[in-house]
Amino acid sequence: MSLEQRVTELESRLAFQDDTIQALNDVLVEQQRVVERLQLQMAAVLKRQEEMVGQFGSFEEDAPPPHY
């Protein structure tokens, strides 16, 4: 394999690696957006649950069993 062929092969591999890195970066950015949305949704659910516990009390409070 000549030096020119080796350089051409390396340039080709580099181009494919650049494309792969960009594709992986795009996926990572989208996943981060999804994680951020899920964190916001989870915070809202936790807040709502805390509000409901404040209004209705916890199910674990010393309530008598249902058969009483």
Swiss-Prot record:
<comment type="similarity">
    <text>Belongs to the SlyX family.</text>
</comment>
<dbReference type="InterPro" id="IPR007236">
    <property type="entry name" value="SlyX"/>
</dbReference>
<protein>
    <recommendedName>
        <fullName>Protein SlyX homolog</fullName>
    </recommendedName>
</protein>
<dbReference type="Pfam" id="PF04102">
    <property type="entry name" value="SlyX"/>
</dbReference>
